[in-house]
Amino acid sequence: MASLTPMMQQYLEIKEQYKDCILFFRLGDFYEMFFSDAEVASRELEITLTGKDCGLEERAPMCGVPFHSADSYIAKLISKGYKVAICEQIEDPALAKGLVKRDVIRIVTPGTVTDSAMLDEKKNNYLMSIYKNKNYYGIACVDLTTGEFLSTHITFGNTFNKLMDEIAKFSPSEIVVNGEFFHDENIKKTLKQRFDVYISGLEDKFFEKEFSIQKVRNYFKDYVIEENAFDLYINASGALLEYLEQTQKVNLSHIQNFNVYRIEEYMILDMATRRNLELTETMREKNRKGSLLWVLDRTMTSMGGRTLRKWIEQPLINLHDIKDRLDAVNEFKERFMIRSEVRELLRAVYDIERLMTKVILGSANCRDLISIKHSIGQVPYIKELLRDLKADLNVLSYNELDTLTDVYEIIDKAIVDDPPVAVKEGGIIKEGFNEEVDRLRSASKDGKKWIAHLESKERERTGIKNLKVGFNKVFGYYIEVTKSYYSQVPDDYIRKQTLANCERYITPELKEIENTVLGAEDRLVELEYQIFVDVRNKVAKEINRLKTTARSLARIDVLCSLAEVADRESYTMPEVTDDDKIEIKDGRHPVVEKIIGQEAFVPNDTYLDMDENQIAIITGPNMAGKSTYMRQVALIVLMAQIGSFVPAKSAKIGIVDRIFTRVGASDDLAAGQSTFMVEMSEVANILGNATSKSLLVLDEIGRGTSTYDGLSIAWAVIEYIGEKIGARTLFATHYHELTELEERIEGIKNYCISVEEKGEDIIFLRKILRGGADNSYGVQVARLAGIPDPVIHRAKEILKKLEDADITRKEKRITRRKQPIEGQIDVFTFNAAQRSYDEVLNELKSLDITTLTPLDAINVLYNLQKKVKG
């Protein structure tokens, strides 16, 4: 260290404190990076890697970016999974004695980004904290850009699966965890691969209960904490607040409301269901287009867009709340003119939530204040329009709409209507607001007039026709003379600079005027900035009123958006009840019909209850529309419970507490699981957590294994749902044998997708009919999919031979009906040898399950199965 230059010593001392960050080290007009940081940044940002003398034998690797365009480079590094520490000069270099003092003023991480250029305006950027205590979890979430703070804990059931569901709900950009969690590489790997999320560790001491209680009390003084309560969310919340303080190093007073929620307060949607129903993004491409959010989002504001996403992610289960929303949507749908005027006013509303965060953090400029002014300027007109509506004014947040006329006037009187971006270059305060500003501005203008007069006078005195007076920040004001007039330069001109085609001079008179002008301008700029900061601070004090109004505007925006969609897409108002019936007339899939057009979509009816129509077994060929139909029913139920109209002629929806889906086949390579293992894990989760109030959507259960294994599993699953759970269920299958269950178990009904045969071809009619299908049409579907003709012909030959070699379908059904299946299916009932049974039983008893890896377990099961089969 002794041989290093003082600046490099300073750099390394600061870097030592932020080892996990790329350090942006301010040097003049650039942020510089050195050593390993420079090598990483030059590669990731595709900028030139150079070197700098640092006092060592070899030059230090170095690269840099201009400070005025640093945001785009920081955004790129954040998107690639890096943290960036911003190290600024914290004293004026002109006044510094020796080395300029520097320090890190902020750490930018994926979960603490506040720059709008790095954010999706209609999506929250959540930072999550997870506290793991044995198999229990505390969770806290914050969106630094809006100040929203949420927390909960998970202390019963399959806690890890519930944790995954909560992470899927919030989709955080970054997760902060305690030591036990951080050092569990398997969990970290699972999180990173499933959610593509950045994991940050924080010392265990910041998760301790006593520390966390004090931290929460410091921020949320009105929240009462019981000292001995087993509230793991307190541990997570305290740690999250500590992490924010460590990274932001500024006042975080915009985080004000401590919202503790119970997972059961809303409809529960697990990770698989969110993915399968494509609520906010498509399953494969992860695109917004093609999701339910894409269909429903006609919001006019960023705040409304984020609120709509939350409604979709967290459907309601309280009947009163659902009806209130539906009534408000209906009111806006019926009152076209009011809706149109409100939406037009909302178009002029900026993102008040995120703008107020910038105000609190001290990063808001004059244009941000003008955006706030324009936004609150719409509120009185919106409030006047809402007064004419009949819907419950509380649902419309009418009483929470504050016209904020005092805040409007604070900004309007002080800040010019079209201010520059920079706040330290003047031109931001209105004329007449401050006498001293007006005086300095006048002095500056008079000085510039004197300079213009001097230029004219000097041209006349010297005879130099193209003489001009110019200015730059290095030399100040100067007189410029081109080469051809050098001989006419007077003796009182003092040369300051020689350029290729001209020379620059000063005179005593010019210097005197310069001192007057620049002195006035410097004082003016400083005074304007002080006034701006004062105005910004006054606005900051009204943050509660502004945030409350922002939430109200967002809610109104969503209600109008849902009404607009209902009107444009011919949706109907559902009748939501507390009973167990789901009755949909001419239901349509909202996304598919949006893509192909309403005229091309074939609507279908649905009827489910807890008596004779509890389980619908749906058969039919691939590509016929079974999956689309089942997803459509689930989406209609979900839409009704967020307060939206639905794509149907009519709909009666008995509230569901959870929607489960097992749709499609996919390997979970991240967890080392096969398609069948993924399927069985999801089915196990459904059977373990579904209630009689749930809606189950199950597609092709058992297809990932052999025919008889798959059929047995599917059969047993249906029995269990019907006899043990009692949930309303849509069950699509290729196992036509399952249609016999209609005669065996009360509450099961068979349905099929209608198909029209034309010669060797088939036409999918997309209509759901009563009864089971008697043909899978596999070869015909293969032809439609583009399988070559020789393969199709050969498939037909093989199919004919297989059908001839087997007993007829009718005989098989008769045989099965003579031998009814009783009770639950036992994996050992097909083995007649008692000796094999004993061997398998003893081997199972001696197994230590806790030491088995997934691969070991599969091998053991394989060997056991061989013994059972003999």
From Swiss-Prot:
<dbReference type="GO" id="GO:0030983">
    <property type="term" value="F:mismatched DNA binding"/>
</dbReference>
<dbReference type="InterPro" id="IPR045076">
    <property type="entry name" value="MutS"/>
</dbReference>
<dbReference type="InterPro" id="IPR017261">
    <property type="entry name" value="DNA_mismatch_repair_MutS/MSH"/>
</dbReference>
<dbReference type="InterPro" id="IPR005748">
    <property type="entry name" value="DNA_mismatch_repair_MutS"/>
</dbReference>
<keyword id="KW-0238">DNA-binding</keyword>
<dbReference type="GO" id="GO:0006298">
    <property type="term" value="P:mismatch repair"/>
</dbReference>
<dbReference type="InterPro" id="IPR027417">
    <property type="entry name" value="P-loop_NTPase"/>
</dbReference>
<protein>
    <recommendedName>
        <fullName>DNA mismatch repair protein MutS</fullName>
    </recommendedName>
</protein>
<dbReference type="InterPro" id="IPR007696">
    <property type="entry name" value="DNA_mismatch_repair_MutS_core"/>
</dbReference>
<dbReference type="Pfam" id="PF05188">
    <property type="entry name" value="MutS_II"/>
</dbReference>
<dbReference type="Pfam" id="PF00488">
    <property type="entry name" value="MutS_V"/>
</dbReference>
<keyword id="KW-0547">Nucleotide-binding</keyword>
<dbReference type="InterPro" id="IPR007695">
    <property type="entry name" value="DNA_mismatch_repair_MutS-lik_N"/>
</dbReference>
<dbReference type="GO" id="GO:0005829">
    <property type="term" value="C:cytosol"/>
</dbReference>
<dbReference type="InterPro" id="IPR036678">
    <property type="entry name" value="MutS_con_dom_sf"/>
</dbReference>
<comment type="function">
    <text>This protein is involved in the repair of mismatches in DNA. It is possible that it carries out the mismatch recognition step. This protein has a weak ATPase activity.</text>
</comment>
<dbReference type="Pfam" id="PF05190">
    <property type="entry name" value="MutS_IV"/>
</dbReference>
<dbReference type="InterPro" id="IPR000432">
    <property type="entry name" value="DNA_mismatch_repair_MutS_C"/>
</dbReference>
<dbReference type="InterPro" id="IPR007861">
    <property type="entry name" value="DNA_mismatch_repair_MutS_clamp"/>
</dbReference>
<keyword id="KW-0234">DNA repair</keyword>
<dbReference type="Pfam" id="PF05192">
    <property type="entry name" value="MutS_III"/>
</dbReference>
<dbReference type="InterPro" id="IPR036187">
    <property type="entry name" value="DNA_mismatch_repair_MutS_sf"/>
</dbReference>
<keyword id="KW-0067">ATP-binding</keyword>
<dbReference type="GO" id="GO:0003684">
    <property type="term" value="F:damaged DNA binding"/>
</dbReference>
<keyword id="KW-0227">DNA damage</keyword>
<feature type="binding site">
    <location>
        <begin position="620"/>
        <end position="627"/>
    </location>
    <ligand>
        <name>ATP</name>
    </ligand>
</feature>
<dbReference type="GO" id="GO:0005524">
    <property type="term" value="F:ATP binding"/>
</dbReference>
<dbReference type="GO" id="GO:0140664">
    <property type="term" value="F:ATP-dependent DNA damage sensor activity"/>
</dbReference>
<comment type="similarity">
    <text>Belongs to the DNA mismatch repair MutS family.</text>
</comment>
<dbReference type="InterPro" id="IPR007860">
    <property type="entry name" value="DNA_mmatch_repair_MutS_con_dom"/>
</dbReference>
<dbReference type="Pfam" id="PF01624">
    <property type="entry name" value="MutS_I"/>
</dbReference>
<dbReference type="InterPro" id="IPR016151">
    <property type="entry name" value="DNA_mismatch_repair_MutS_N"/>
</dbReference>
